[in-house]
Amino acid sequence: MNGNEPHGGVLINRCDPACHFEGCACQAELDQLALSDLELIAIGGYSPLTGFLGEKDYHSVVKEMRLANGLPWSLPITLPVGEKTARQLSAGDHVKLVKDGVTYGMITVTDIYQPDKTQEALSVFKTNDPAHPGVKKLLARPDYYIGGPITVSSLPDKSFEQFYATPAETRAAFQKLGWKTIVGFQTRNPVHRAHEYIQKTALETVDGLLLHPLVGETKSDDIPSDIRMESYQALLNHYYPKDRVMLSVFPAAMRYAGPREAIFHALVRKNYGCTHFIVGRDHAGVGSYYGTYDAQNIFQSFTEEELGIKPLFFEHSFYCRKCGNMGTSKTCPHSPRDHIHLSGTKVRELLRQGKKPPKEFSRPEVAAVLIKGLHQQPVAIKQNSGELQ
């Protein structure tokens, strides 16, 4: 395993502000998922991808979790278009990529194909239940895919620009800080004591932590990213060593693909310069579609050498009254009745009532931010199950 090397050996950069669009045959309207994928391809987050998957790579990823050349890649990164657009295109055509009247770049078409969405859903999400948010999104998108390399002339407006960094920029920051080993942590939820315990346990063995919250498209009942970002800052300011942690946003959308998304999240953090990646229980899960530790077990499908990043597996952590500290079933011998564990639903109920969860569960500074933020939300938002992600 060559630490810190991008996936595939080269950090991709598909940004070209001088890109011209005069020769484009037509344009394709992007949805929010495609726009975030376009951005991450362009800045190298999805290295070695230089564009949206062609048909051969698509089928290989769906069936084998590998690109056609054998390199591990667990999620199909595709660009859907409607039948009318698909039928007027040919290989070699240039297509403008737009959203809401803004042109972001273009794709040079190599492939035009119609996927079997039922098979894609069953392979990627382990279900074709339309109630699953990832399946619902898949089925709602247009029925044809176009593949080929992309060129991006301008990136989307940056959310939380102060905390935005490309893979090249995080790598440069790690080098400047002198970090040789970096553990990445993916989250779409607030960080409570259980997450803090796991992060700090990992931090004992590496040089630095990249706290990399996802701020792209999520379910409507996930906590809004602006509230989460404020809660992360409150936590880091009070409880983490400032020279050992970097907070940076991850502009991807959630797919809720559970085990496959855990592999994907690890590979992407490898591109950002991480050497290690934390995988907790039900990583990127939703509802009861995946087993508690499926997202850890899937790593057995690959060697650590071919992934190029070391997964760190953690069991569910909790505060034990008898131990007087945080722990897991590996370190605590006591009964579950001695453990403080609140469901996400219960935590949200307390926060909405203006009540702080027990200090053993959530830092008071974090709870205060969440209470304030949720009371300012015009629409009630339910907390998803209290999984670590």
UniProtKB/Swiss-Prot annotation:
It comes from the Bacteria. Keywords: ATP-binding, Nucleotide-binding, Nucleotidyltransferase, Transferase. The keyword Secreted does not apply. It is an enzyme of class 2 (transferase). Pfam families: ATP-sulfurylase, PUA_2. GO terms for molecular function: ATP binding; sulfate adenylyltransferase (ATP) activity. One of its GO terms (biological process) is hydrogen sulfide biosynthetic process. It catalyses: sulfate + ATP + H(+) = adenosine 5'-phosphosulfate + diphosphate. Pathway: Sulfur metabolism; hydrogen sulfide biosynthesis; sulfite from sulfate: step 1/3. Its EC number is 2.7.7.4. SUPFAM superfamilies: Nucleotidylyl transferase (SSF52374), PUA domain-like (SSF88697). InterPro entries: ATP-Sase_PUA-like_dom, PUA-like_sf, Rossmann-like_a/b/a_fold, SO4_adenylyltransferase_pro, Sulfurylase_cat_dom, Sulphate_adenylyltransferase. Belongs to the sulfate adenylyltransferase family. This is Probable sulfate adenylyltransferase.
